[in-house]
Structure formats: C-alpha cells, structure tokens
Amino acid sequence: MSLYREVDAFRVDDERRRVPEKVVNDIEVRIRINGGMEQRFTASPQALEEFATGYLLGEGLVDSVDDIVSIEISDNIIDAEIESGDLDIRRELVMGSDCFGGWRQRVEMVGPVDSDLRVRADDIFLAFKRMVKSAVVWRMTGGTHVAALVTGDEFRVFEDVSRHVAVDKVIGSGAMDGVNFRESFIVYSGRMPADMLIKVVRAGVPIIASNAAPTSSGYDAAQRTGLTMLGFVRGKRFNIYSHPERII
C-alpha cells in the first residue's frame, strides 16, 4: 500500500472549486507478543518489521534483537515471539505506562545513558535539513511525522502518521543493521514526553533533538536518565534542556 492517496476536496479562497488533494494513508496495526499480550496502533503501512523491532526494544520487552525469536506479519497483524524471561513484569510496565504516572515507574527501571558521544551544533542543523528534505510524504500531505537516526555518515529516516511509530521504525532499522546506538543521535518532528524519551534511552541513544517542545514529564525523564534533549531546532538555533556537555 502506498503511503498516500489522492482524494477530491473543495478549496475555498476567493471562490470555491474542486481540487485533487493527497492524504496520508493510515492503518490499524496489532502487535501480538507470544500469542498473548496485544497492543493496537495507528501507523503508516510500511516498515512494519522495523516498527515491531523498535517497539519491542523501546518498550523494554527485549534487551536486544537477539531476544527476538521471530516476527511474522500478515494482514496488518504482527506476531512476535520473544524470549519470555520476566515478560509478566515487563508487560505490566508497558500496559501501565500512560496512566497514573506510570512513566515514573518505568524511568526507574532504565539505566543512565552510557555514551561519550559529542556532536557539533552544525551537525544537528545539517541533520534536520536532511531530514526535512527526505520527508517527501509530509511535503505532499502534511500528515506525517518524520524521524532520523544519525550514526556518523549513516542516515536512516522514516515517516509515519504517529511520531512514536516513526521513532520505533528508526530504532528498529538501526537495531536490525547492528548500529552502535551509543554513537548515534535522533532528530525528529514532535513533542518530547517522557514515554518517547524512555524509548530512546532504552535503545541507548544519548541525544534527541526536535523542532517541537518538551513536556514537563519529558524534561524530568531526560534529567534522570542522562539523555541530552534539544528542542525548538529551527534555523540556526535550539534550546538544550538537559546534559548540554554532549553538544559542542
């Protein structure tokens, strides 16, 4: 399935006229883990294996791709088999993550970021320019978020209707290719709440930069985990909200 389709719309300015417009395609995706635990997502219909891999890592359901036994995809249903271990405990953290301050329990289970990476401000600006240039579907539809993982000269980028899924996809793609996340940074479009930052920290990425704002929970999570968080990356400026020593 394409990432977008063309529909009829009426444009109203000085007059009203029928015009063709492109809209982004979205689907409901289900992830079933070990035949039991199930989560539903709205996502763009591509790179579902990368999404599943990044989701499993970012939610702490596995510690590495070696813990993933298999991923099978059929009719927008993803069946993932993983090494079970302490799955019941991990499942409780995932299912409760968005309610009653559940992110605070999750952040206590995440170790501090272990990375000596240093990044020049100009590299952040260049990565953002490249990310925006790569966001073809966003330019056509205005309906996607975009995320990029930068590792030295390597640059991988995904668009998705969900900002969380876009980040899952770049993490999953990097993990499948054996990327050293401790030597990587993520740039993306979207707010930075705690659940997003915990996902990045679990992968081992030390820096995240967005053109949008952090939330207070995101600020607290970044401070606690040692993550360097940049917001409002626009033109030739940005704000550093935590652990500024990584930006030179």
Swiss-Prot record:
* BP GO annotations: Mo-molybdopterin cofactor biosynthetic process
Specify where it is mainly localized. cytoplasm
Give residues annotated as binding Mo-bis(molybdopterin guanine dinucleotide).
232-237
Domain of life of the native organism: Archaea
Record has Cytoplasm as a keyword: yes
Gene3D superfamilies recorded for this chain? 3.10.20.10, Cytidine Deaminase, domain 2
**Compartments where found:** Cytoplasm
Q: What is this protein called?
A: Sulfur carrier protein FdhD
Q: Which gene encodes it?
A: fdhD
